[in-house]
Each structure stands twice: as structure tokens, then as C-alpha cells.
Amino acid sequence: MIIVNTQKLFNQLKQHIQTKPFVLLQIYSDVKAHPQENRVSCYYVDFQDEQYIVPIHHTEKYQDEIQMIETNQTIFVSDIKKYKHNTLVISKDVRDMNWSYYLQHNKPYDFEQHLTGAHHHYNRLHYNKDDVNDLVPLVKHIEYLEPIAKNLYQSYEEHDQTTLLTLQDIERHGLRTYEKMVYSEYNPYTSTGRPSNRFGGMNFAALNKSDGSRKEFISRFNNGVLVEMDFDAYHLRLIGEIIGYQFPKG
């Protein structure tokens, strides 16, 4: 394991990234903030035979500014939506390992099983503070990320990712309210495969029609309007029609 704490080591990593595919995982600084409004505490880069940890906003960082890297190599990530929101390395070939795991097992990978005692301690101690992950020692982030990279990479199978890329594109644009932009987060990892849409305790897919919850959302354009559309995508009735099953009325 190499902790990138000098420019020399960062240059070494940049060269290595050009040579072969690798796993790229990230730890966000704030466990509560939306990825679009968050920042990365550190990156974990796994080449199978060698691993790097790169502190970005972590307290153990060696400098304030880190250059982004471009590569033609394949990058394996645990969440392509979060990768698109914030990344250290840019590539045209990015594979989502958790999406592959979900399509094989009909459930997402359990990341929380690898959280260390240090992660739980800092989150309990600083539950009301921002950027807590910047305080968790890098060695503990490594301990958390190592098994994730290994397990997901070993089980990866290639699948179409159009759904994830489309959802991320919707997420990054946000929703305008009278006060600010707010961001939702689509969760495609449901038992039915029908994505949910929520963040920060708000279910954007089921806003109350009678208590004024919907009134705060406005068009981002001058003289613009919001148009509501209802459609049948992901509805179980569509599957019934395909296989000839008649659902009972009511």
C-alpha cells in the first residue's frame, strides 16, 4: 500500500494509471451531503498487484491542489453516478461493479459491513459536524476499501449501464426552489428494479399533493413552467401484458 504524500509518488501513480485497468474508489468528506454538493476526502486506486491511497481534502493530504488525470484504461468503480459527480481520473471506459453485483444477486453490495470501529466512533462523536471522513485516519479508510475493491472486482460481469448514466444526468441538474437548488438521488437498487428518488429525508417521487410540499419547486428559467407527466415505465402491468398475465381488478 502506497500513501501518496509527495509529488514524486503522485507522478508515479499517474504513470501507473496509463498502463493497465484499475479499481478506483472514493471516500466523500461529508457522509450526509449530496455528491453534487460534496467533496472527496481520498481516493483508493487498486491495480491488483499494487494499491495507492490519495488524500485530497483529508487532514493527511500533502498539498491543496491535485491535478485530474486522463487515461485510456478501463476504470472499475463502485458507483458510476458518484464517479461522474466527482473524480480524480477521467476515462471513456468506466464500469460500475455494484451494478453488476446487483444484476447478479438482485441486491446491492453491502458496503457498511466493512466500516471500521473508527468510522463508527467518529460518526457518533461528530454526528452534527460536516466532513467527518476527513478526520478518520487514512489507514482506516484503507481497511474499509480494500475488501470492497477485491470482492466487487472478482465478481464483475459486464452489463449495460445506460440506466445509471441517465439517472446521473438527471441528478446533476437538480431542482430549483424559491431559495436554492436541491438535489435528489436515484436508487436503482430496489427489489423490483424500479428506481426510487429521494434524498435528505424527502421522497421526490411521492411529494404530497395536499400539504403544499410541491409548491416550493419552480422552473429554473425565467417565465418557465414545470410540466408533470405520468407514464407506465417500470410498472408491473407492462410485464403482465408481455407474459399474458391478467392482474385482478382493484
Q: Model features per residue range: what roles?
A:
Residues 1-115, 240, 246:
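Conserved RNase H-like, two-metal-ion catalytic cores of nucleic-acid enzymes
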Residues 33-39, 48-49, 179-250:
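Acidic, glycine-rich two-metal-ion catalytic cores of nucleic acid-processing enzymes
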Residues 86, 91-93, 97-108, 112-117, ...:
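Mixed-charge, glycine-rich, non-catalytic linkers/tails in nucleic-acid processing enzymes
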Residues 55, 60-70, 79, 153-157, ...:
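Alpha-helix initiation/capping motif
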Residues 3, 20, 145-147, 205-207:
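A short linear-motif detector with a strong N-terminal bias
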Residues 21, 164, 223-225:
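Residues at beta-strand starts and edge strands
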